[in-house]
Swiss-Prot record:
Signal peptide: none annotated. Monomer and homodimer. Belongs to the 2'-deoxynucleoside 5'-phosphate N-hydrolase 1 family. Its EC number is 3.2.2.-. One of its GO terms (biological process) is deoxyribonucleoside monophosphate catabolic process. Keywords: Cytoplasm, Glycosidase, Hydrolase, Nucleotide metabolism, Nucleus. Part of a nucleotide salvage pathway that eliminates epigenetically modified 5-hydroxymethyl-dCMP (hmdCMP) in a two-step process entailing deamination to cytotoxic 5-hydroxymethyl-dUMP (hmdUMP), followed by its hydrolysis into 5-hydroxymethyluracil (hmU) and 2-deoxy-D-ribose 5-phosphate (deoxyribosephosphate). Catalyzes the second step in that pathway, the hydrolysis of the N-glycosidic bond in hmdUMP, degrading this cytotoxic nucleotide to avoid its genomic integration. GO terms for cellular component: cytoplasm; nucleus. It holds the Pfam family Nuc_deoxyrib_tr. It comes from Branchiostoma floridae. It is found in: Cytoplasm; Nucleus. This is 5-hydroxymethyl-dUMP N-hydrolase. GO terms for molecular function: 5-hydroxymethyl-dUMP N-hydrolase activity. 5-hydroxymethyl-dUMP binds at residues 6, 8, 42, 44, 48, 72.
């Protein structure tokens, strides 16, 4: 577990799939907000975002447009300006984007 100015990041080693799913869903359910980096397509991240939407969590999706790949319309189209935010970003902008998102929670 890594603490960063009030944020907690978890890292764990490979293990039983059911245990990983159970733990990730517990962390997600306990969270107030979800921040997802969505530049690389990921079924797991998409699943977690879907569960977060179902649980009415505030969600921030961060996307680096310079990577040459387009962002899924399902993610970009979910942006509502309030509970589901999609932000294109460059690395130096991340602290400010996080501060703005978390202060409006």
């Amino acid at each position: 577990m890594i603490h960063f100015k009030g944020l907690i990041f978890y890292h764990y080693s490979a293990g039983d799939d059911v245990a990983i799913h159970t733990q990730d869903m517990a962390w997600l359910e306990e969270s107030d907000v979800v921040v997802a980096e969505v530049t690389q397509p990921s079924l797991g991240v998409g699943y977690e975002i879907g569960r977060a939407v179902a649980w009415k969590k505030r969600i921030l999706c961060l996307y680096r447009p310079d990577d040459g790949k387009g962002l899924s319309a399902m993610v970009r189209g979910a942006h509502d300006g309030k509970n589901f935010i999609v932000k294109d970003y460059q690395e130096p902008e991340v602290p400010g984007i996080l501060k703005e998102f978390l202060s409006s929670s």
